[in-house]
Regions:
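Positively charged n-region of N-terminal signal peptides that target proteins for export
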Residues: 1-5
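Sec/Tat signal peptide C-region and signal peptidase I cleavage site
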Residues: 16-22
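N-terminal secretory/targeting leader peptides
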Residues: 23-120, 128-334
Length: 334
């Protein structure tokens, strides 16, 4: 029986970490490398990756060995897609915003105030349109294995934000997302696209004034330390696509592929069920650390919705009205 170990407990560099990890795999086992950009624990994606590796390494012992590389140790999300096609890694879970070079359909998840809450996101993911959307990139060699939620996004800045006009003239870090860029412009603010690993330093040095993220990202990356509080807007979902290359998945023996995908499906359901509690816990940790969380009044929240929702019209043709309708209908189910 192999022992599962995260790359994070090895040396700080990949050159030192790689041999230590290789020793955890047995001769003849298929090595599955999973690269992601967040903390190894205490974060919904990091915890889900660990859970997946533990299940694979236990239940597929002798067949497969999964190694997890957190905190951009191997690749950031901008480089990992090429690495998947080259076979340098087998699994990644970038934010859905990161796939614009391959499909515009995932812009759906960036639309502001589309989903009411995480339960709505889960219902859409389980629906037929949501499942079909996993295959949006098969023509370029990628296949989605599941959606991993991280939570709803909040805004923070170096000054209090209560209504959109408070953000006028500020510079906000965003992911590589045209929807997010349009949303920030609708606030009268400026968008700056930066890699996740660069955000803390950019906030600390004033390269950007603010950012938008989940409670888990804000806490585990310590963004709250260099911001004047967080405004609880819940304006977007942050979700990740667990993705692999179609070539790698198709090359597995049928029984291995079936067992692996069954584990992936079960871990996805279990991990997503835990997100709301993890987000609430990290929100409380931010408060306990002495940061300020600003809760909007209904009138203030309406001002954010009114400012941002017109952005939908700019991207309706890219996404498809049918997908937008399916996502909206998930708010009314359950």
């Amino acid at each position: 029986m192999k022992t599962f170990a995260l790359a994070a407990v090895a040396a700080a560099t990949f050159a030192l970490a790689s041999p230590a990890l290789a020793e955890d795999c047995q001769d003849g086992e298929m090595v599955i490398k999973f690269s992601h950009v967040v903390a190894a624990s205490g974060h919904p994606k990091g915890d889900a990756a660990t859970m997946l590796a533990e299940r694979v390494n236990k239940e597929m012992d002798g067949k497969a060995c999964m190694q997890v590389f957190p905190n951009s140790q191997l690749f950031d999300d901008d480089k990992v897609m090429e690495a998947l096609l080259l076979g340098d890694v087998q699994l990644a879970a970038p934010s859905l915003s990161k796939f614009e070079a391959y499909t515009l359909k995932y812009r759906l998840f960036d639309l502001p105030f589309l989903f009411n809450d995480l339960s709505s996101v889960d219902r859409f993911a389980a629906s037929e349109p949501g499942k079909n959307l996993l295959n949006a990139m098969t023509d370029v060699g990628f296949i989605g294995l599941g959606y991993w939620s991280s939570g709803m996004k909040q805004f923070s800045a170096n000054k209090p934000l209560l209504v959109p006009s408070d953000a006028e003239g500020l510079k906000f870090r965003i992911q590589t997302s045209d929807v997010a860029e349009a949303m920030i412009a609708a606030m009268g603010a400026n968008a700056q696209k930066l890699a996740f690993k660069e955000v803390y330093g950019a906030l600390q040095t004033g390269v950007v004034d603010g950012q938008e993220n989940t409670w888990s990202n804000i806490y585990t990356q310590k963004f709250f330390e260099v911001q004047d509080g967080i405004t609880e807007t819940n304006h977007q979902v942050l979700a990740y696509l667990l993705v692999t290359s179609d070539e790698w998945l198709g090359g597995l023996d049928d029984d291995v592929r079936e067992q692996f995908l069954k584990i992936v499906d079960e871990v996805t359901i279990e991990a997503n069920a835990q997100v709301a509690a993890k987000e609430a816990a990290n929100r409380q940790k931010i408060l306990d650390a002495g940061s300020t969380i600003r809760v909007l009044t209904p009138e203030q929240r309406k001002a954010w919705v009114d400012a941002m929702k017109p952005v939908w019209g700019e991207f309706r043709d890219d996404i498809g009205q049918d997908l937008i309708d399916a996502a909206q209908s998930s708010n009314n189910a359950g």
